Amino acid sequence: MKNLYKKKWIYLVLCIFFSVFFFNVLNHLRNSSNSKTFYYTPITPEQFGATGLGKELDTEALQKAINSGSHLVLKSGATYLIDKPLIINHSIKIETSKKNEKPAIILQKNKDSALIFKNDPVKSTYVKQTITPNQSYVVLESTEGMKIGDLLHLKSDKLWYWDNRHYLTKGELHKITKIQGNKVYLESPTSEYYKIKEGEKVTAIAYPERNLELYNISFKHPKPQNTTMLKINYTSNARMEGISVINSKMAGVLLNKTFHTYVSNSYVELGTTKDIKTGYGIQDYGGIGNVITTSTFKKVRRGVDFSGDTPSRYGTVSYSKAFGYKKDTLAVGNSGFGTHSTAEHILFENNYIENFNYAFVTRGNHISIRNNILKGFSRSFVATSYGDNVKIWDNMYESKNGSKLDYFAIIPRQYHGAFTATDNTINGLTGPFIKRNSKDLRYIHVSSNHTIP
């Protein structure tokens, strides 16, 4: 009797085991047939039905390819016609098949962006303890869900010091290097003083580590449109090389709070008109450590601009060229390069500018302008407006077709900071070296400049 009872139990256990086994096998097969394969080896849009002929829409095929892999290779010389923005939400590399040959074209036929990189936050919390400048960590209310490598964006409820427009605030962007309880260590020291004990509120939002690489690709509209072509959000160490952007009148590339983006050997021609108040070739909006180099900007209101709802910091533009129209052709404030409002520790060096109202516009703190060349029809080399610590040295203005500057620098009444201009050469000047309306400068030093009327 006992043996019979034992056999029944063994039979029952075996039945349950095989039932569960076959159920899992069937479930796996069913899920496998419905799931999307994600490729880590190179894939092409043609695998997903794209033609690349510029006649039929390739939007769906491109989007499927983007969703399916981390390395997308476009055909050299192909034109991929799209009617919606391509959306990216994971790390990816997109490049034309042959680096030094004709780039693939992504042609956006509609009045919309061509590409949007999205990176949704993983955590939103608050700063719990006062932060002082040059601090290596911050203490948060919670760190649940955060990881090493995440970006951390701090945003205060206290307005920025200059030209805050009632919504631009103190804040900064960081990368997390260590998490110890509620203490988060940062890759670079903090910039600001946040007085939490005195009632200042600072939100802390974490974004996962995501990377974007774009190589040898042209993004276009058939004709100029009031759009921003590429919208890049919260990336880490993104790289863009050999990119061209054509006919997006508002902005070519928006870098929204990106960490250490590197843009090189790229070309932007927007077709910007006088009604456009932005017209930025590249706009660094609240980023940190972004570098734009060896790139060319045409038909823009400003080649590169640094700003943000919280400050853009430690950005550089070097060895780049900006070609504008004669003065007063575009909207007020047009310049080869510049900053406005929320920008700190920005360097412009070894650049070439033609025309524009100004070679540089500065509205920020610790703005350095060195060894740049301006030619053509402009009002002044530099126009300051709000901020502090503007330093201009070793630059040159050269006359072209009889052109002359009205002034080398304009310092308006709203600028009360420090201003330094040394060792600059001006070949063609009709007015005084500096037009100064501000009567309350903290410091001014002007010396060793060379002027030819």
Task: Tell what function each PLM region has.
Residues 2-15:
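N-terminal Sec-pathway targeting helices
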Residues 30-61:
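Right-handed parallel beta-helix/beta-solenoid
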Residues 69, 89-91, 93-95, 110-111, 118-158, 171, 207-222, 232-247, ...:
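Parallel beta-helix/beta-solenoid
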Residues 83-85, 104-111, 222-229, 249-256, ...:
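Short glycine/acidic-rich loop motifs that flank beta-strands on beta-rich extracellular proteins
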Residues 217, 243, 266, 295, ...:
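Consensus "Asn ladder" position of solenoid repeat domains
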Residues 49, 59, 70-112, 156-172, ...:
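N-terminal extracellular ligand-recognition/capping segment immediately after the signal peptide
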Residues 101-179, 185-188, 193:
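Autoprocessing Asn-cyclization modules and mimics
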